[in-house]
């Protein structure tokens, strides 16, 4: 049996993290690897494309119905999906009441105690990355996830979130074994996106693992609650996800301790690539029309 690889996909909300991770994991399963997905996002959408389901019952919701987590059996919380991928969603409380990160902590403890990680090649944590509270940092803080892959794009806030996640990895890297595996750029077709992604990776001391091109077939597959790997296995996009999976598979043990940058350095990078045209503070807060009038 191969040694267990514990990876995590982090990223800004809405960046396509869950879609990217599920397609990557479907490709890994297609390669013959045994996969467990632990969804750590309150939306509980980390497994929907693998299970063809709107949302999986979460550990916290099932525990509430049963009385406590101790009253649950592993078979009740774990569902089997595409290519025998095992799926679990941690869940969280109602919006506005309590800490959603509590579900992450409760779930991982329950899974470990009940042998969920046995006979598995990969366990993948799909984590909301622009929330930096301790609960969501749990896979990093408790040395559960060894390799972190950050899904980002060429958008300012996606890069900002990637840098913030890198700060979290740096904080716990010395006390545990967590490392940054690399960045995955989920294309949004912004200006000079590939250049920016490669530059940010370089500044963080890591690599751009893969640049995933934008393709409407991803949305077509999602509407049918399927990964592209399953929905259109012969498509160009499916092969992109297979290439990404291959890169992740071959990246074991190659993670690094990141070197996060400051907000000023991030803005400087945008200026270097012509996204922000000048450092002139007088232009801050000016509309496009106002700037055009000034330059006329």
Curated annotation (Swiss-Prot):
Molecular function as annotated in GO: 4 iron, 4 sulfur cluster binding; ATP binding; metal ion binding; nitrogenase activity
The protein's role, per its UniProt record: The key enzymatic reactions in nitrogen fixation are catalyzed by the nitrogenase complex, which has 2 components: the iron protein and the molybdenum-iron protein.
CDD domains per record: NifH
Catalytic activity: N2 + 8 reduced [2Fe-2S]-[ferredoxin] + 16 ATP + 16 H2O = H2 + 8 oxidized [2Fe-2S]-[ferredoxin] + 2 NH4(+) + 16 ADP + 16 phosphate + 6 H(+)
Keywords: 4Fe-4S, ADP-ribosylation, ATP-binding, Iron, Iron-sulfur, Metal-binding, Nitrogen fixation, Nucleotide-binding, Oxidoreductase
Recorded name of the encoding gene: nifH2
Protein name: Nitrogenase iron protein 2
PTM comment: The reversible ADP-ribosylation of Arg-102 inactivates the nitrogenase reductase and regulates nitrogenase activity.
Record: residues binding ATP: 11-18
Oligomeric and partner information: Homodimer.
Domain of life: Bacteria
Entries under Gene3D superfamilies matching the protein: P-loop containing nucleotide triphosphate hydrolases (3.40.50.300)
Residues found modified as ADP-ribosylarginine: 102
